[in-house]
């Protein structure tokens, strides 16, 4: 009976008119918080959804939100709410004052091939940190100057990360290089950076899918949120297992 009640609680859905059905207990059920997508929503609807999530969970995370959406949320949010906005990538986190992210002990490495890949990497960073992970990052270390990579990759390895997110556009070569060196899972993120033949991330995605380095998984083009969630799930499972192993005879 207790297990059944727990399942019902963790499956709770909050309906907002005929607008949205919020999976408010997603994080307790599967370890990943619900992330509200700003694309395609009016500023008013987005603010209503975001503030309901804030009310229910103490925190709301919004991705791909424009300045109008940010403005609507800011205008209607409680005055004591903590609002963290990265307007360069359209990412917003709003929290109640008593909400604190529990640190899990999970560690993630985060690399980009170029400066233009940073916005997608920042999506991954924010998601992973909101899932309790520490993120060790190094940007603009791609194969056009491969010597830039090794010092930063050595530091990431020495910090004993549990997974690494590698973000690259154009030919998308960096993830395969990294996966051929390290002994932890690598999540590759192709970006839409690049032009000409194979533009908009097509070459990068194809190259990553064709990579011969094992231990490499690929998300969709510009899929920073997905990559951050996957990397954090891996890292948090490892951290939990390490913690449990301390008490094994």
Segments the model singles out, each with a brief description of its role:
Residues 152-191:
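Glycine-rich phosphate-binding loop
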Residues 82-86, 178-202:
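Short, acidic/small-residue loops that bind anionic groups at enzyme active sites
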Residues 91-93, 97, 136-157, 201-203, ...:
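Glycine-rich oxoanion-binding loops at beta->alpha junctions
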Residues 103-148:
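Glycine-rich phosphate/diphosphate-binding loop of Rossmann-like nucleotide-binding domains
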Residues 112-116, 154-156, 163, 193, ...:
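C-terminal binding/interaction regions
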Residues 44-46, 117-122, 146-147, 168-178, ...:
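Short glycine/serine/threonine-rich phosphate/pyrophosphate-binding segments
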Residues 1-76, 82:
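Long amphipathic alpha-helical segments
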